[in-house]
Amino acid sequence: MKYLLDVNMLIQGIWQGHPGHVSAFAWLKGKNLSICPLVELGYIRISTGVLGAPMPETRRLLQVFLTERKVSRIDDDLPALESSPQKSSEVTDHYLACLAQKHGLKLATFDTRISHHAVEVIS
């Protein structure tokens, strides 16, 4: 199985100080992984804004992760109106699940609130 990472999986997989890093790091090992520009941008925004990490370090760690894990990139090539979230809090997650489905992937997430058949909740 090939997986599209959501923003939280990417953050937890990269930042060693994150409480979820150990479980994310263990799950990610040996998996066939993909990301898309939306996820990359979300990682950068949260890492630099919420976590307060410096931009150069944030970008460097992302590049190291992508290279070491041999993560492939997929295009954000699904029109936004082709996903159909029911409320505003579902917009990005539902889009990523639909994007994963379009590319024959599963969306890997720790978020149990995403209701979509292309989602694999990691525990």
Residue ranges and their predicted role:
Residues 9-10, 39, 79, 113-114:
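Alpha-helix capping/helix-boundary segments
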Residues 24-31, 100, 113-116:
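Alpha-helix C-terminal capping segments
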Residues 1-35, 50-57:
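Short, well-structured N-terminal submotif of metal-dependent ribonuclease cores
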Residues 36-46:
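Short, conserved active-site loops that position catalytic residues or coordinate cofactors/metal ions
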Residues 116-123:
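Active-site regions of enzymes building and remodeling cell-envelope glycoconjugates
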